[in-house]
């Protein structure tokens, strides 16, 4: 491969490409989450009739996947480049393949496959038709058409593209370990992230206070419900994200039994559904401001 972009150059290339194709460039959301889908820029905006086109990098924390900075590709925190487009463009797959070309990956020279992998996130009431994108036998992207988010049907359909930046960069730079990636010229990925990987793994598996985390979950849940009662969508959703991350820490610590796990996930899911319903209702009160007049007319005609 001729063009070995740094991780930083990859991000800038994707930002420029998707911006030129109508996406707003958002910034990473400042609350811990397990995936870019859980950002309010995806979760909330995928529901309701308003159009939404956004792209952003999202650091995603998965405590159970931490490996003390010793595993070449299993990470406590990885980075996703998230693209969300509603309504989904007819040529979304072609746009994706075009973006790969700009990263130096010519689809005509590589084995690129869309492998069916329908997606769901039960804890957030989400599901959709999906594909894993495989590049020469390695998964690099998740491609999803949302059918349901927060228990609500998605009309119009939202398309989501989630690039796994570390995996994609490992392929482009031809390295075996993510820690050998060049983040920018002269600075390795490991020089930035190996210490936090070690420390967060040690905390998640050995040091975290289970009793405190259990109490925190209950407190965050209580506060989320208070916000829901006041129809405060975004504060409520922040506390739901805190509940989700706290659960993931408990799960990594082995503090949650199989039976308890289902109960915790149901508690998170019920709150997520409530927030989704309130969000759509509040946007409707505002007249769905991101809809243009033609879409208003079309909606009324239906």
UniProtKB/Swiss-Prot annotation:
Keyword field contains Nucleotide-binding: yes
UniProt-recorded Gene Ontology molecular function terms: ATP binding; catalytic activity, acting on a protein; glycine-tRNA ligase activity; transferase activity
GO cellular component: cytosol
UniProt-annotated location(s): Cytoplasm
Pfam families xref list: tRNA-synt_2e
Keywords carried by this UniProt record: Aminoacyl-tRNA synthetase, ATP-binding, Cytoplasm, Ligase, Nucleotide-binding, Protein biosynthesis
Catalysis performed (reactions): tRNA(Gly) + glycine + ATP = glycyl-tRNA(Gly) + AMP + diphosphate
SUPFAM superfamilies, per database record: Class II aaRS and biotin synthetases (SSF55681)
A GO biological process held by the record: glycyl-tRNA aminoacylation
Subunit structure: Tetramer of two alpha and two beta subunits.
PANTHER family in alphabetical order: GLYCINE--TRNA LIGASE, CHLOROPLASTIC_MITOCHONDRIAL 2, GLYCYL-TRNA SYNTHETASE
Family membership: Belongs to the class-II aminoacyl-tRNA synthetase family.
Protein name: Glycine--tRNA ligase alpha subunit
Gene: glyQ
